Regions:
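Short active-site neighborhood of thiol/selenol oxidoreductases, capturing the structured segment around
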Residues: 1-7
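Thiol-based oxidoreductase modules, predominantly thioredoxin-like and allied folds used
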Residues: 6, 25, 29-42
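The canonical Cys-X-X-Cys-His
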Residues: 11-14, 56
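Typically the conserved alpha-helix immediately C-terminal to a functionally engaged Cys/Sec
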Residues: 15-27
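Short loop/turn elements that flank and shape the SAM/SAH-binding pocket of Class I
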Residues: 41-43, 75-76
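Structural micro-motif
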Residues: 48-57
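Non-catalytic, surface beta->alpha helical segment in thiol-disulfide oxidoreductase systems
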Residues: 57-83
Length: 83
């Protein structure tokens, strides 16, 4: 499983969520987390139809989207996609 973490350096909610993402990285070492700066990788953001940040897209082993969360969320909301 993989999480695509769409963010920007200037985004306050993205910065606030950094601790939550780091916690998920520690608790689920088998899950890969790819951080995508929308200012530097705008084409990738467009390809995934990311309209606001932070956006977290959950992909299965085949690379298919199985979940999406937008905005600041509690860790439990993100974690439900990992079970």
């Amino acid at each position: 499983m993989k999480i695509l973490d769409f963010y920007a350096d200037w985004c306050g909610p993205c910065k606030a969520m950094a601790h939550t993402i780091e916690s998920l990285e520690r608790r689920y070492p088998e899950v890969k987390i790819e951080k995508i700066d929308v200012d530097k990788q705008s084409k990738k953001a467009e390809a995934y139809n990311v309209m606001s940040i932070p956006t977290y897209i959950f992909l299965n082993e085949e690379g298919e989207e199985i979940g999406r969360e937008v905005g600041s969320k509690p860790e439990s909301e993100l974690e439900k996609h990992l079970k």
